[in-house]
């Protein structure tokens, strides 16, 4: 029974000694600050150098455009929920955020020499007046760039003259555009050939991504500026 007191003292000394050893390990030794404690709160991922992000150029293009070219991105609307976007030279010409898009055809007219926006409007092709669209695209000047993004329904109100005018701007698909198709297109007044910048997806219940609508389309590229001499 007389050994109980000394044993308690020995146990206390051993306990203090072990505590000191653990603290020393955590602190990393004298003069080393708190690196070991910091390691406990550092995730393995944070110690690995993050991979560099891929650089994005104007309008989010993965590569820069050549000199005297205009960078663009055109995105059609998704069903009747998400509005379209038209970006040129890193400037958003039309979008839901700008509150200048709507059901039907969203069209931005751009000066082919300067790249400056002339006018941007949305035309309701379900319940609107097609004559408003015709008045907009009939008097275009030579070299005017025409950016088009569909939203919901681009074609119900289209007539033969409308389809002919878009075909003259370089469209291959305007003549067959139908109810709720998805369509993005970049053309120009006075072009001799068909535009390389056009995408079209038919509305089909067998292939539609959404219930009643095909997938949204996204197109990007570089358009050569029109020279003042041409």
From Swiss-Prot:
Tagged with keyword Transcription regulation: no
This protein's UniProt keywords: Disulfide bond, Lectin, Secreted, Signal
InterPro entries for this protein: FAM3 (IPR039220), ILEI/PANDER_dom (IPR039477), ILEI_FAM3C (IPR039475)
GO molecular function annotation: carbohydrate binding
Compartment(s) where it occurs, according to its Swiss-Prot or TrEMBL record: Secreted
GG-type lectin domain location: 68-226
Family affiliation: Belongs to the FAM3 family.
Name by which UniProt lists this protein: Protein FAM3A
Lineage: Eukaryota, Metazoa, Chordata, Craniata, Vertebrata
């Amino acid at each position: 029974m007389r050994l109980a007191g000394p044993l308690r003292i020995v146990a206390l000394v051993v306990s203090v000694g072990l505590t000191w050893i653990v603290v020393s390990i955590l602190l990393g030794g004298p003069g080393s600050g708190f690196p070991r404690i910091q390691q406990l709160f550092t995730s393995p991922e944070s110690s690995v150098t993050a991979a560099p992000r891929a650089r994005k150029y104007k309008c989010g293009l993965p590569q820069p455009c050549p000199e005297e070219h205009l960078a663009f991105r055109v995105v059609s609307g998704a069903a009747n929920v998400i509005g379209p976007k038209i970006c040129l030279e890193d400037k958003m010409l039309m979008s839901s955020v700008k509150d200048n898009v709507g059901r039907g055809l969203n069209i931005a007219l751009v000066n082919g020499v300067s790249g400056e926006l002339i006018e941007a409007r949305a035309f309701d092709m379900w319940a609107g007046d097609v004559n408003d669209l015709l008045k907009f695209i009939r008097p275009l000047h030579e070299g005017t760039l025409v950016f088009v993004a569909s939203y919901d329904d681009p074609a119900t109100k289209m007539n033969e003259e409308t389809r002919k005018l878009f075909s003259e701007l370089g469209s291959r698909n305007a003549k067959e555009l139908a109810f709720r198709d998805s369509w993005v297109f970049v053309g120009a007044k006075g072009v001799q050939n068909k535009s390389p910048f056009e995408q079209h997806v038919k509305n089909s219940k067998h292939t539609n991504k959404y219930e009643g609508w095909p997938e949204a389309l996204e197109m990007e590229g570089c358009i050569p500026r029109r020279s003042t001499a041409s």
